[in-house]
Amino acid sequence: MRKLLIIFTIVAAVSCNPSVTEHGTYSDFERVPLKSEIKNVQPMTGIVLWNTNGRSTTAKDKIQLEYSYMLYNDVCKEKDVFDWTPMDKLLEQVASRGHQLVVRFRYTYVGQQCAVPDYIKAWPGYEETSGKSEGRTTYFPDWRCEELQRFHLEFHKRFAERYDKDPRLAFVQTGFGLWAEYHIYDGPCIMGKTFPSHKFQETFYKEMDKYFDETTWSISIDAADAYYSPLNAKKELLDIPFGNFDDSFMHETHHEYNRDCWMFFGEDSYKDGPRGGEFSYYSDYDQKHCLDKEGMYGRTFESQVAEYHMTYILGNDQPGYQSMDRIKEASMSMGYKFEIKDFRVKGNEAAVLITNIGVAPIYRDSYVAVGGVKGEYSLKNLMPGEEVWIHVKGEGVSDQIVPTIECDHLVPGQKIEYKADVI
């Protein structure tokens, strides 16, 4: 699971002692005054709007993330022929606004045709199921079909090969059932047919662990249900690092079923993968009041973000109920947040004491740098409440240069900020 905190950088072993004195760590380095503020929503965090939401353009400085579905049959229509043009265009559009994408792959949507590729629909023995879901005719894939199973794995493999390190992509959501939310709460749910068997799902988890090296993929918290997923029976699958999303966040009884689902994956699962989701649509009241400063149902948004270590949340309707300034403010309570508590320099060496004052880690490698010289310690390992001394040595380091936080997984216009009040 989560690696132990390693704090060796460049050529020196550095201390993680939170109480640094003149007789302690780097006492022979000269402290350099440093002041900085976090003024913006940080990359890869915050409230997410659909890529089609006009506010993604007109208020683009208030958010960092955009959301979209991607349909399997938009990319593949013939066997082993993958046309990624729709995905490339989507990523390009989102990045042009200085944002990154949260994408979800899905087959089934209430009231719509199934997004299984046409060639599979014509496959011998394939029989799609139609049924009523929320009163509308909805189509479900035939998971008995071995070609569908093979395609599903191949799709994610090809996607990872192409986009795993693409800075335009923040997070990937995937799954099965209605909206890929890991349930068919209303409609023809037949395990092994309209919903994949536990055996295939086990294979899927293991293969996904092989496909992705950098991108943190996520599944719904509803996968905690022993009926739908093999995770209860095969607890070792929980050792695979993945994130979760909760698509009814903050509804009235969220502290019951939803919390149980979150805790099933482990109280500290946020250390391995991001926690995200969507504001509840259980009632209009939920959408209208989820970001109210005074909260709803006795809970504020910020308190729930802290409790569940949330990094992002889809809130596409929120511009209709809240100001973009409030949306920005709420977004800034999510995810990681760095503070530099001490900055010391000696010749071409620097020592930076940095802490994570946020509610979650950053899920991509990021590094403290001084004068273009990076420390070796990745801030991806810095959990909330932890702090670490980072030692930097090399040409370019001086007391005239302020530290920066460098990350290769950013699009033009993005910057990781930090708080500092070193005197």
Segments predicted by a language model, with ranges:
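C-terminal motif of bacterial Sec signal peptides marking the signal peptidase cleavage site
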Residues: 14-15
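Substrate-binding cleft/loops of secretory-pathway carbohydrate-active enzymes
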Residues: 176-274
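Conserved, mostly hydrophobic/aromatic
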Residues: 66, 94, 159, 172, ...
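Short, well-ordered coil/turn segments that N-cap beta-strands
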Residues: 62-64, 97-101, 165-170, 212-217, ...
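N-terminal substrate-binding region of glycoside hydrolase catalytic domains
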Residues: 23-147, 264-267, 271-322
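Active-site groove signature of glycoside hydrolases
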Residues: 128-194
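Extracellular/luminal regions of secreted and cell-surface proteins that mediate adhesion/ECM remodeling
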Residues: 332-423
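Positively charged n-region of N-terminal signal peptides that target proteins for export
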Residues: 1-4
